From Swiss-Prot:
Protein name: Chorismate synthase
Protein's gene: aroC
EC number of this enzyme: 4.2.3.5
Native organism taxonomy: Bacteria, Pseudomonadati, Myxococcota, Myxococcia, Myxococcales
UniProt keywords, alphabetically: Amino-acid biosynthesis, Aromatic amino acid biosynthesis, FAD, Flavoprotein, FMN, Lyase, NADP
Gene Ontology biological process terms, A to Z: amino acid biosynthetic process; aromatic amino acid family biosynthetic process; chorismate biosynthetic process
Binding site for FMN: 127-129, 247-248, 291, 306-310, 332
The protein's role, per its UniProt record: This reaction introduces a second double bond into the aromatic ring system.
Length: 381
């Protein structure tokens, strides 16, 4: 069994819900760790007013007993406190309020309304909103729990806000991770964070928004997770697809993937072996992936987030109802959400890694999966 899930819910609806299937029985779930990731997603310099309203927490409804997975589908919900302020506008039982027709460039509003034959883009934007990533993060926390049991850890770091970008080539150390988690910009360099805050403040003052980039890392992965056999089984393709499925992510880089101007001997990673360490590399330009499979080095992927298209200083658009020129409608939004996106990035990467590991090692009980991973690691040494 591999992992799969479905989610439902609107940004200002009663709740975001998910059903996940495929987790082996006996996995210990730390509910506080799940809620901690939800709180991490709410943090970040440049966030909007919504995060002052919500206090996100996951309510588990099925698939666990006494903090352990049972092997049955897991159901969970993240409730929207802000629904109380929107219940007359966003309700399964009635339609109210002014129609949203001043569609916003950069959003799903126009294409979604035309595709589904809607005269009110509210039905599009409520589902397309990045608010849905709250339940994504809760699902990712479950995947992290499975990965941790198998010796794999996932973390992230913001590496760019606006044009100011850094290129760390290794996962953060424990001390750096502590600094990252303490930072309102999810970075371990306070001088750099101060520069970034100034950029965010400048965009806020002009009624704009600003994007950036983040790295996601995974350590402890064995060699050979993923496959070279078919394109849809290549782990790099799956990770890129998962990250590009996150709202506002426009590009993904694996390792030093954009540095293709280097000659080959400066781009690839020489292979070494010794009995104690097994196979190893002294560089990690590939970012832990070769030929669609993990190569035993730390995974490193970078995702690029566009500036949020909802802005106080709006762009020109067309009214969906009249086809007349107008200004895009403003909805409460963030100036910068890159730190939050990094936490979402962790979640989707963790999910894909957990799925790929279960594909390879199988098992209906966690202990079966763990033993299979250990036996494989011993074989390839």
């Amino acid at each position: 069994m591999t992992l799969r899930y479905l989610t439902a819910g609107e940004s200002h609806g009663p709740a975001l819900v998910a059903i996940a299937e495929g987790f082996p029985a006996g996995l210990a779930v730390d509910f506080e760790a799940v809620d901690r990731d939800l709180r991490r997603r709410q943090k970040g310099y440049g966030r909007g007013g919504r995060m002052k309203i919500e206090t996100d927490a996951a309510q588990f409804l099925a698939g666990l007993r006494g903090g352990l997975t049972t092997g049955a589908p897991i159901a969970l919900a993240v409730w929207n406190k802000d629904h109380e302020n929107w219940k007359d506008l966003v309700s399964p039982y009635a339609r109210g309020g002014k129609k949203f027709t001043q569609v916003r460039p950069g959003h799903a509003d126009l294409a979604g309304a035309l595709k589904y034959g809607l005269d009110d883009a509210r039905d599009v934007l409520e589902r397309a909103s990045a608010r849905s990533t709250a339940v994504t993060v809760a699902l990712g926390a479950l995947a992290k729990a499975l990965l941790s049991t198998l010796g794999v850890e996932v973390c992230s770091r913001v590496v760019a806000i606006g044009p100011r970008e850094i290129r760390p080539d290794a996962p953060p150390t424990p001390a750096q991770r502590d600094a990252i988690e303490a930072s309102d910009l999810h970075v371990d360099d306070e001088a750099l964070a101060a520069e970034w805050r100034a950029l965010i403040d400048a965009e806020k003052a002009r009624g704009g928004s600003i994007g950036g980039a983040f790295d996601v890392y995974a350590t402890g992965l064995p060699i050979g997770v993923g496959s070279h056999v078919h394109p849809d089984r290549r782990l790099d393709a799956r990770l890129a697809g998962a990250l590009c499925g996150v709202q506002a992510i426009r590009a993904v880089e694996i390792g030093d993937g954009t540095q293709v101007g280097r000659p080959g001997y400066e781009f690839h990673d020489a292979i070494h072996h010794d009995p104690a360490r097994g196979f190893w590399r002294d560089t990690n330009r590939a970012g832990g992936l070769e030929g669609g499979m993990t190569d035993g080095m730390p995974l490193r992927v970078r995702a690029y987030m566009k500036p949020i298209p909802t802005m106080l200083h709006p762009l020109a658009t067309v009214d969906l109802a009249t086809r007349a020129a107008t200004q895009a409608r403003y909805e409460r939004s963030d100036v910068c959400a890159v730190p939050a996106a990094a936490v979402v990035g962790e979640a989707v990467v963790a999910w894909e890694l957990a799925n790929a590991l279960l594909e390879k090692f199988g098992g209906d009980a966690v202990e079966d999966v763990r033993r299979a991973v250990e036996a494989y690691a011993a074989r390839i040494r």
